Amino acid sequence: MSQSLFSLAFGVGTQNRQDAWLEVFYALPLLNPSAEIVAAVAPILGYSSGNQALAFTSQQAYQLADALKGIDAAQSALLSRLAESQKPLVATLLAEDAAPSSTPEAYLKLHLLSHRLVKPHGVNLSGIFPLLPNVAWTNIGAVDLAELAELQLEARLKGKLLEVFSVDKFPKMTDYVVPAGVRIADTARVRLGAYIGEGTTVMHEGFVNFNAGTEGPGMIEGRVSAGVFVGKGSDLGGGCSTMGTLSGGGNIVISVGEGCLIGANAGIGIPLGDRNIVEAGLYITAGTKVALLDEQNTLVKVVKARDLAGQPDLLFRRNSQNGAVECKTNKTAIELNEALHAHN
């Protein structure tokens, strides 16, 4: 068959005693695989169309490896390794970027992000939460919560310890992929589904959620919430916050432009343009009243912070004498008014 796919990946995962998927590891996910690859694997897997997660056997893995030998050496080598697995295997084929409908599909979408094959908001994650089971992430891998107590007792009786690192829907990214050229001081603070660009350093206080991330290079010592993308050369100071779109009913997509600095313990609820600075300790929400100052420190007008969203070269600060939130710029009053009207 000659068919194009949005994505294709061969994985090995963990199932509970009811054979329900807990997680899937895809070593080499493909975005827009060639029609030649699809034509080679479809007959072996029994795939015809649509988005499907198909379990396959070790024997099929050998057949797939042989079929891809002259087409994609890396995928062929991976399948040869998967054929030796004692864990369940799954091939996930996505004809289109539709909302995921199974746990293997959901995990493939998260892998595409963390492998830097797509950027945040570049893949459909609608309805992903019910597809990600809440599991115990332990030193022996993912464990169904209903089976955890028995396994803990079993380990103790053998003089061993079953250590639970977290109980969550999302595993840490680095258990699945470590992107090239990054530093992550505390790996538990970066979830699978994060996009960590080359040159990014995530320090101990930094956190990056799924469907969020950094272009890189940059320094992250604050929270990059779900849906937030940080431009290259931007730094997030210790304990700072970016408002996400998952809580509070917010539907504004927050982003940080290039060359920005968000000070320690500061926060933003608006998208920042390039080369913006937010003073340490200052939290700006969309409705914050901001006194707009020109290059002569003259008050131009008072606006809501949302009116300044995406504007470049702004310094947000709090007046230490009267507490007013001010925005300083290197533009004249006339240029400022023109920019505001153009934005509206």
Curated annotation (Swiss-Prot):
Protein name stated in the entry: 2,3,4,5-tetrahydropyridine-2,6-dicarboxylate N-succinyltransferase
Keywords, ordered alphabetically: Acyltransferase, Amino-acid biosynthesis, Cytoplasm, Diaminopimelate biosynthesis, Lysine biosynthesis, Magnesium, Metal-binding, Transferase
Listed pathway(s): Amino-acid biosynthesis; L-lysine biosynthesis via DAP pathway; LL-2,6-diaminopimelate from (S)-tetrahydrodipicolinate (succinylase route): step 1/3
Protein species of origin: Pseudomonas paraeruginosa (strain DSM 24068 / PA7)
Protease as UniProt keyword: no
Assembly mode: Homotrimer.
Function: Catalyzes the conversion of the cyclic tetrahydrodipicolinate (THDP) into the acyclic N-succinyl-L-2-amino-6-oxopimelate using succinyl-CoA.
E.C. code: 2.3.1.117
Family (UniProt): Belongs to the type 2 tetrahydrodipicolinate N-succinyltransferase family.
InterPro entries per UniProt: DapD_gammaproteobac, Hexapep, THDPS_M, THDPS_M_sf, Trimer_LpxA-like_sf, Type2_DapD
Pfam families: Hexapep_2 (PF14602), THDPS_M (PF14789), THDPS_N (PF14790)
